[in-house]
């Protein structure tokens, strides 16, 4: 047994160098993003549960937008990662241009919804009038960010598949410092700025998104030499690439869209349990993100390496790499769980919130420290290995099936009908992570997941 365990980690030195070269910049980028989220929740938490809950629930609508773009970029990344493995730069440029046009449609749609129907959106998540009122102000401002954020998300997601990861780190780092400073100004009214409360966080986020957009646009137009995006491709339609995207990328988009709607249903359930539950989950989410930040880097690296390897038609090597990434996910997941359990008291102590909110956060963190082992495996396989291997139709089932058939109904019954303790409710809401991890592990081990989607 020990020899088997040791063998799965035995890879050529280049494997781990490639993995770390991708994972470390992404990890640092995610750390910066988590820093923004933590600063936001701490600043807004000092204003009370209403402000914190309003921003958290309004951001669920933004989360739908973001995950749709993760789906767009992830679906395209299945193609571009394998295009890069076979050395087809022109197809990568055409794919990126095609995705910008599709993104523009979603960006404008979400802008209209957020600008003109914010109250209706907030009522989906909570019946609390004070939370709705704060959320409306937040969402109206944040909706302008949709017009630029889609472009940035698509560009970063696809550029990662060809090994360009430092751009995201650079743009995120600059926007991070801008966001923290601007939030401090507009939330509390410092340096002569108006005191806007929760809406001030939206102003800071909007300006930082614009800065991020400008950095990425300047890079693509004036600096990039690797894939050489052509402006003229924006005005062309490549039928072959579009057909490939519809066949292999659409399942990713559909699964991510249905998944995010399901995750929003979980937020609706928590919203019906009160602002304390919402605020506690915001605190728990920050700690979970912090403790799994390296895992997310490894999961992204797995997608790049597997996609490039499959594109180069090295299928046996891709299968071996997949098993190594699975083993790494288990190890990192266990470490993350221990870290969450160890840091929960310290983390909760940072927040100036009510005692009941702290009690709920404590319960959620206990549950998360167990669930995170399974979510580590699930994230690495669904967003990295299996997706990059082209097994997108299987993943559409894995991402959606258990969330809608188990987690949402069980969570609703436990939280809204039976009013069970928060920790038990949270476990019910996350039960799909456990089953998905086991199902995807079985899929990986039967070696039926590799599909070269770039073959003519």
Question: Each PLM stretch: what is its role?
Answer:
Residues 1-23, 80-145, 193-250, 306-371, ...:
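Short alpha-helical transmembrane segments in multi-pass integral membrane proteins
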Residues 11-42, 46-47, 60-75, 79, ...:
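N-terminal transmembrane alpha-helices
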Residues 21-40, 141, 152, 175, ...:
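Transmembrane helical elements of multi-pass membrane transporters/channels
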Residues 31, 35-53, 122-129, 185-196, ...:
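Helix-terminus/linker motif at the lipid-water interface of multi-pass membrane proteins
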Residues 44-63, 95, 129-134, 198-200, ...:
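Interfacial/gating helices of multi-pass transporter permease domains
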Residues 52-115, 149-168, 267, 278-344, ...:
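Small-residue-rich hydrophobic transmembrane alpha-helices
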Residues 73, 142-160, 168-179, 201-216, ...:
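Short runs within selected transmembrane alpha-helices of multi-pass transporters and secretion channels
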Residues 114, 157, 183, 187, ...:
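Structural signal for membrane-spanning alpha-helices in multi-pass inner-membrane proteins
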């Amino acid at each position: 047994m020990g020899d088997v365990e040791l063998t799965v980690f035995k890879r050529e030195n280049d494997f781990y160098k490639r993995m770390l070269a991708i994972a470390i910049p992404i990890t640092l980028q995610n750390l910066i993003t988590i820093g923004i989220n933590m600063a936001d929740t701490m600043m807004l938490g000092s204003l009370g549960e209403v402000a914190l809950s309003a921003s958290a629930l309004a951001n669920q609508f933004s989360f739908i937008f973001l995950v749709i773009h993760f789906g767009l970029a992830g679906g395209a990344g299945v193609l571009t990662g394998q295009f890069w493995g076979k050395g087809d730069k022109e197809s990568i440029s055409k794919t990126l241009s095609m995705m910008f046009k599709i993104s523009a449609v979603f960006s404008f749609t979400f802008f209209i919804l957020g600008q003109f129907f914010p109250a209706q959106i907030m009522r989906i998540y909570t019946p609390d009038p004070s939370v709705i009122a704060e959320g409306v102000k937040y969402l109206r401002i944040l909706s302008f960010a949709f017009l630029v954020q889609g472009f940035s998300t698509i560009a970063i997601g696809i550029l990662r598949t060809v090994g360009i990861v430092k751009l995201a780190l650079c743009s995120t780092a600059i926007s991070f410092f801008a966001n923290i400073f601007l939030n401090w100004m507009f939330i509390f009214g410092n340096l002569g700025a108006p005191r806007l409360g929760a809406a001030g966080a939206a102003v800071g986020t909007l300006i930082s998104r614009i800065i991020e957009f400008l950095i990425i646009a300047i890079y693509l137009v004036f600096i990039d030499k690797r894939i050489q995006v052509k402006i003229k491709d924006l005005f062309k339609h490549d039928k072959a690439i579009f057909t490939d995207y519809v066949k292999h990328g659409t399942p990713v988009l559909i699964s991510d869209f249905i998944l995010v709607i399901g995750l929003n249903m979980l937020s609706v359930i928590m919203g019906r349990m009160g602002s304390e539950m919402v605020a506690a989950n915001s605190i728990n989410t920050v700690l979970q993100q912090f403790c799994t930040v390296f895992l997310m880097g490894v999961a992204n690296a797995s997608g790049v390496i597997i996609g490039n390897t499959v594109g180069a038609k090295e299928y046996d090597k891709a299968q071996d790499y997949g098993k190594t990434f699975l083993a790494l996910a288990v190890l990192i997941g266990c470490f993350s769980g221990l870290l969450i359990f160890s840091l929960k008291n310290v983390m909760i102590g940072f927040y100036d919130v009510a005692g009941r909110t702290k009690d709920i956060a404590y319960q959620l963190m206990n549950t998360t420290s167990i669930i995170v082992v399974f979510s580590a495996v699930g994230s690495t396989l669904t967003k990295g290995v299996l997706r990059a291997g082209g097994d997108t139709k299987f993943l559409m089932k894995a991402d959606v099936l258990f969330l809608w058939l188990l987690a949402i109904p069980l969570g609703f019954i436990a939280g809204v009908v039976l009013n069970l303790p928060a920790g038990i409710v949270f476990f019910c809401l996350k039960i799909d992570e456990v089953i998905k991890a086991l199902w995807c592990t079985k899929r990986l081990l039967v070696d039926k997941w590799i599909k070269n989607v770039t073959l003519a």
